[in-house]
Every structure is written in structure tokens, then in C-alpha cells.
């Protein structure tokens, strides 16, 4: 799941080149950490025109010196227009946007920058219709930009560690507003007939991992935890049966929600991941209304 599509999550990208080059949130990392813009007015005042945006992106992309984005050669020549480059070795032309999320787009960098700001600072996310209105493009174009930005915000593959909370939730599947003869039977509880189950893990004071899964059976839940949580970490969950064997692999503490227990002595709880779900669902119901399983992940 591409979480920042729905939440204001600060992504601290520490690698500025190589694999991070096509990630537009390299830029967001820089403005959050270095310039720390507090408002959209401050942001647009700083990035006031296309020339400023281009110079800023060049500074980031060519941090360690100019190079050809096709072959990596360090001898390149700039055209008189200041926007295009040609490699002295492979003779290929390119712009500062080539092989980035901005590539193949005729939209100005300034438009992309503002879109990224809006998407990353909206707590509950922003719909493509609203984004289109705010940056002056069509809904189709805003959707295209939104999807590119979301894909660039893929989750870190590193494992969580320390104190990790686990929980599962379901997205979609509301049948109450349908006519009785169009309702799918057997959708209550943990049924996945019309709902998408999502497994979530959050490191206390750290990152989140959330993935759409086929079910929340014991084997599936255990596999998700092993994939994303470092062995030796302390795992906190509720009393859902699928977590009952995980104590063989991790120090495991349980909060018995079924008995009205939500916090145990020693700050043992799963409130962090549950708060995450609450924020997610406010964005889902209030902004997106419906989401296919494909776009949920």
C-alpha cells in the first residue's frame, strides 16, 4: 500500500542519487529538512517560476556533478536554451526531467512541485478532482500526476524493529446502501467477499508497513510479520486468534480488547496502529469514497 497517498508522512530520503533519482520526494525531503516551508504561500513564493524550480532540481540531481542520465558519462554539454543537455560520449540528448517521475510530461516543474506539496501536506489525502482545481489541470491529468507521485512513494523495504504493533483492518464492502436484492450475502465480520483485508505494522516512533492481503488467517498474518519485522523485536497485538502462535518467534504481548482492555502496564497497547487505521479511514470515506483493491495497494 502506498500510504502517503492518504497521510501526511514525512519521507526522509537519505540517498539523493542512483535509485532515488526518479523519486520526486527527494525534493520534498530537501524543502522539509532545509527550508521548512510552513504554508503554501511560502512554498509558491520560493518556487516562484519555472527557472527557480529547474535550478533547484538540477542542484539536487547533479549534487555530485553533472552526468549523462543515459550512460553516466560526466562530460555533457548544455544547449543554449539552458534546458537540454547532450552527452559527449553517447551523443544522446536529455533534460533534467529525463528518467524521473516528471519524464514524458509536458507540465512545468512548478506545477509538479505544487502538486507534491498539496499531496504530502494533506492529512487525509486529496482527490484528483480537487487537485485538478487547485493546480489548473484536467481531472485526467491530475489523476496521472497523482498516480506517478504515489508510485514514487513506495514503502521502504527495511524491516521494522524495537517495539512493533500489529493489527488488521478491512476496506470497502459496505452493503447497507444497496437494494436488498443486490446485496452480497455473508459479508459481515471478517468476510473478504466484498472487502479487502489489510495487514498493518507500525514501529513505535518509526515507520509503517501496510499491505493488502488475501486473508487474515494465521499463516498469512505470521508471514507478513516475519517479512516486515526483525526477529527479536517486541510485538504488541490484540487478542485476535491469528496472533496466538507468533510468540514462538517474537517476544509477544497481548492487549485483550474482548475484555475491555486497551492499555496494559508498561505502555503495552496497539493504539498507534489503530490510530493509523482511523486516520486512513477518515481519508477513505471523506475524500476518496471508494477505492479498488488495485489502487488500494
Give the location of each predicted region.
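Residue-level recognition of single "structural anchor" positions
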Residues: 6, 10-297
Amino acid at each position: 500500500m502506498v500510504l502517503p497517498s492518504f497521510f501526511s508522512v514525512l519521507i526522509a530520503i537519505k540517498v539523493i542519487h542512483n535509485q532515488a533519482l526518479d523519486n520526486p520526494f527527494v525534493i520534498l525531503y530537501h524543502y522539509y529538512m532545509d527550508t521548512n516551508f510552513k504554508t503554501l504561500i511560502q512554498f509558491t513564493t520560493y518556487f516562484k517560476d519555472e527557472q527557480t524550480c529547474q535550478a533547484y532540481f538540477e542542484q539536487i540531481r547533479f549534487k555530485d556533478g553533472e552526468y549523462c542520465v543515459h550512460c553516466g558519462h560526466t562530460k555533457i554539454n548544455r544547449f543554449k536554451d539552458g534546458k537540454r543537455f547532450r552527452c559527449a560520449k553517447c551523443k544522446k540528448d536529455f533534460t533534467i526531467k529525463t528518467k524521473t517521475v516528471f519524464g514524458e510530461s509536458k507540465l512545468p516543474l512548478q506545477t509538479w512541485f505544487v502538486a507534491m506539496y498539496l499531496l504530502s501536506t494533506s492529512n487525509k489525502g486529496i482527490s484528483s478532482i480537487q487537485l485538478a482545481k487547485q493546480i489548473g489541470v484536467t481531472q485526467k491529468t491530475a489523476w496521472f500526476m497523482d498516480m506517478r507521485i504515489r508510485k514514487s512513494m513506495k514503502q521502504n523495504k527495511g524491516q521494522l524493529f524495537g517495539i512493533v504493533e500489529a493489527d488488521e483492518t478491512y476496506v470497502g464492502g459496505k452493503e447497507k446502501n444497496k437494494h436488498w436484492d443486490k446485496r452480497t450475502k455473508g459479508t459481515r465480520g471478517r468476510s473478504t467477499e466484498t472487502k479487502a483485508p489489510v495487514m498493518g505494522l507500525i514501529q513505535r516512533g518509526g515507520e509503517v508497513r501496510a499491505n493488502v492481503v488475501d486473508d487474515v488467517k494465521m499463516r498469512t498474518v505470521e508471514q507478513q510479520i516475519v517479512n516486515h519485522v526483525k526477529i527479536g523485536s517486541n510485538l504488541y497485538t490484540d487478542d485476535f486468534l491469528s496472533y496466538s502462535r507468533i510468540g514462538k518467534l517474537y517476544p509477544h504481548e497481548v492487549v485483550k480488547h474482548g475484555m475491555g482492555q486497551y492499555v496494559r502496564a508498561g505502555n503495552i497497547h496497539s493504539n498507534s496502529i489503530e490510530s493509523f487505521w482511523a486516520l486512513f479511514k477518515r481519508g477513505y470515506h471523506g475524500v476518496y469514497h471508494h477505492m479498488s483493491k488495485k489502487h488500494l495497494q
